[in-house]
Regions:
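Surface-exposed loops/turns
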Residues: 9-11, 53, 65-66, 191-192
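Divalent metal-coordination and catalytic microenvironments
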Residues: 17, 29, 71-73, 87, ...
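Beta-strand signatures of extracellular beta-sandwich domains
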Residues: 28-32, 210-212
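Polar, glycine-rich mid-to-C-terminal structural blocks
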Residues: 112, 118-172
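Short solvent-exposed strand-capping/beta-turn motif centered on an Asx-Ser/Thr pair
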Residues: 20-25, 66, 201-206
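Histidine- and aromatic-rich segments of cupredoxin/plastocyanin-like copper-binding domains
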Residues: 39-52, 148-220
Length: 220
């Protein structure tokens, strides 16, 4: 899996982003959390026509904010197979809120996500069918024995009749969890004692991530 290109801008810039669609299907890109003209928002058949296969599309909009954002395909289930990436907007150096020693630290974009070897269309179908398969893969199914033991046999039968199985918060089993499109990341350009600024986005389809740092507290 490879995430898409990494746009880095400074507040006050004008973004010009050319999308070359080399797919055999339509696509589009949505700029998550960005303030921009409606026609550049990237929702096919609503704010723009989809980008046809083997054509080029230009997104052009002013950058009027700063922060850590991300972008993703808004067509079909393309986001679930890796069409997403970080979108970083730096503060201007003359911004009165610019913090020396923080905003000028080396920045590392980190986009977290997940990966399943199942085709996204199959995942979508299995969720609609309320299958127990993903729960079985994660060893989180509730057996009839457990339901009887805990006094919830009637509830379990009623829920199954309603096709409301005992799913957890994230109903999909993932084969890998990714950082910038890989299952691990090495930052060999830094040494012990260096300070860096992580620009973190959650590009996952259904996963929550809890971040810890072996060296102590993370300043947010």
């Amino acid at each position: 899996v490879q995430t898409c290109a990494l746009p880095i801008f400074t507040e006050g810039d004008t973004a010009e982003i050319y999308v070359y669609n080399e797919l055999d299907e339509e696509t589009s890109l949505h700029w998550h959390g960005l303030f921009l003209p409606n026609k550049e928002d990237g929702v096919p058949y609503l704010t723009q026509m989809p980008i046809k296969p083997h054509t080029t599309h230009l997104y052009r909009f002013p950058i009027i904010q700063h922060g850590t954002h991300w972008y993703h395909s808004h067509s079909g289930l393309q986001e679930q197979i890796g069409m997403y990436g970080s979108f970083i907007i730096n503060k201007r150096a003359d911004d009165p809120t610019f913090r020396k020693g923080i905003d000028d630290l080396p920045a590392i974009p980190v986009i977290l996500s997940e990966w399943t070897d199942y085709k996204p269309g199959n995942v979508h179908r299995m969720l609609h069918n309320a299958s127990d398969w993903f729960a079985i893969k994660k060893n989180t199914t509730q057996s009839y024995f457990e339901a009887i033991k805990l006094g919830y046999f009637k509830t379990k039968v009623t829920n199954e009749w309603k096709r409301m199985l005992a799913m957890d918060v994230s109903d999909v089993y993932y084969d890998k969890f990714l950082i910038n499109g890989h299952n691990e990341s090495q930052l060999s350009q830094f040494k012990g004692g260096d300070k860096v600024r992580l620009r973190v986005s959650n590009g996952g389809a259904s996963s929550y991530f809890w971040l810890t740092y072996a060296g102590g507290k993370i300043t947010v």
